[in-house]
């Protein structure tokens, strides 16, 4: 996932040293595709299924997809502090043992209060995370005006021992939808912020933020605290990876990366390549269409649908932790049979070299 200067982001992977918490400075945050990893559970007991989790993290790394642990897809709201730390430690160990020592880990640290969010940031760093991603709590959404939200993200960024990504996801935060002025203002004022994930799906907002952070003056006037953590603008859905490339976005953090890692990684690579070779645009457009249709269809079934597809494709996945229900049998059958899903599966198998059903 090396950036090679993509969209104005310098690749600083050659840096040496480590944070006091053990997070290596050489694990740069680079443009590309990241996947929010599901948390897998043992049937009946609902204990963490660490074996499946570790295997999945490595499977994605082999496809050049990097992990986000304990995010929305990872059912972070259902996890204890200790479980969050265990997942980070398990992922780091699995990646290192598989030879992916340079793959960074992003950890979700969103929760209720500012105090606990900061506490989770410290725990994530201690467990081996390189970066955190933070969502505003939606419990008191009606009372959190722009000033309160700015104060929240500023304080978390200042007190987190590792760089922080802003997570804008209105559906998971009581309708809180950060606008581009607030996000760019935070980016300018908080050197420990290293990006934003826009699961609002607002391409206009993404374009405006990219216009600010891609200016050459931004990096010089607002340098990051960690030189390996430039401010990345990342989409939250797979259906606008190609269009976002043309406004200087840096990739995406997408649930579809779990189901179709090769297809989504290839789409990002192709999208970047079209900037230098426009003859590749028709191929990129074709793949973007397949990915967009598949993403839209699968997203309707949420976490349970993604876990069902993982079970169907790879033999692990299971069901969500209660009270989140599993996908109904009829809905699961319809999802698997859907032509958009079957088309995506076919492309994924072709790109991964697995041609058998």
How would you describe each model-predicted region?
Residues 2-7, 13, 242-357:
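Structured C-terminal cap/extension of enzyme domains
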Residues 49-52, 56, 83, 87, ...:
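General structural feature for long, well-ordered alpha-helical segments within catalytic domains
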Residues 135-152, 197-212, 332-342:
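Repeat-unit-sized solenoid/scaffold elements
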Residues 2-7, 16-175, 352:
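Active-site beta->alpha loop and helix N-cap motifs at the rims of alpha/beta catalytic domains
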Residues 95, 160, 190, 310-314:
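A broad structural signal for alpha-helix termini and local helix breaks/kinks
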Residues 155-159, 163, 170-300:
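Catalytic alpha/beta core domains of metabolic enzymes, predominantly
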């Amino acid at each position: 996932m090396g950036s090679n200067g993509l969209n104005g982001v310098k690749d600083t992977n050659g840096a040496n040293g480590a944070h006091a918490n053990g997070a290596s400075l050489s694990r740069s945050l680079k443009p590309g595709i990241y996947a929010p990893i599901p948390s897998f559970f043992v049937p009946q007991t609902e204990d963490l299924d660490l074996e499946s989790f570790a295997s999945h993290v490595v499977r994605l790394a082999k496809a050049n997809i990097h992990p986000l642990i304990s995010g929305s897809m990872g059912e972070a709201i259902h996890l204890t502090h200790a479980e969050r730390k265990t997942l980070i430690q398990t992922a780091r160990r699995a990646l290192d043992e598989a030879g992916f020592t340079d793959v960074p880990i992003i950890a979700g640290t969103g929760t209720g209060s500012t105090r606990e969010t900061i506490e989770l940031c410290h725990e994530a760093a201690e467990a081996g995370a390189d970066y955190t991603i933070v969502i505003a709590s939606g419990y008191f959404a009606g009372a959190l005006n722009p000033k309160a939200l700015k104060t929240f993200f500023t304080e978390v960024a200042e007190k987190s021992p590792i760089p922080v990504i802003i997570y804008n996801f209105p559906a998971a935060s009581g309708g809180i939808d950060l606008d581009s002025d607030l996000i760019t203002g935070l980016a300018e004022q908080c050197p420990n912020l290293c990006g934003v994930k826009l699961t609002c799906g607002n391409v206009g907002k993404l374009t405006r933020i990219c216009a600010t952070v891609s200016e050459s003056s931004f990096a010089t006037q607002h340098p990051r605290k960690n030189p390996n953590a430039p401010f990345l603008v990342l989409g939250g859905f797979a259906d606008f990876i190609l269009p976002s490339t043309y406004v200087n976005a840096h990739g995406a953090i997408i649930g579809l990366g779990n189901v179709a890692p090769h297809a989504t990684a290839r789409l990002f690579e192709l999208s970047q390549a079209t900037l230098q070779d426009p003859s590749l645009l028709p191929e990129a457009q074709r793949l973007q269409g397949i990915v967009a249709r598949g993403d839209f269809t699968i997203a309707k079934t949420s976490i349970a649908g993604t876990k069902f597809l993982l079970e169907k494709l790879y033999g692990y996945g299971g069901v969500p932790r209660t009270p989140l229900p599993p996908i109904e049998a009829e809905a699961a059958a319809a999802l698997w049979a859907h032509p958009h899903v079957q088309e995506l599966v076919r492309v994924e198998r072709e790109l991964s070299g697995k041609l058998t059903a």
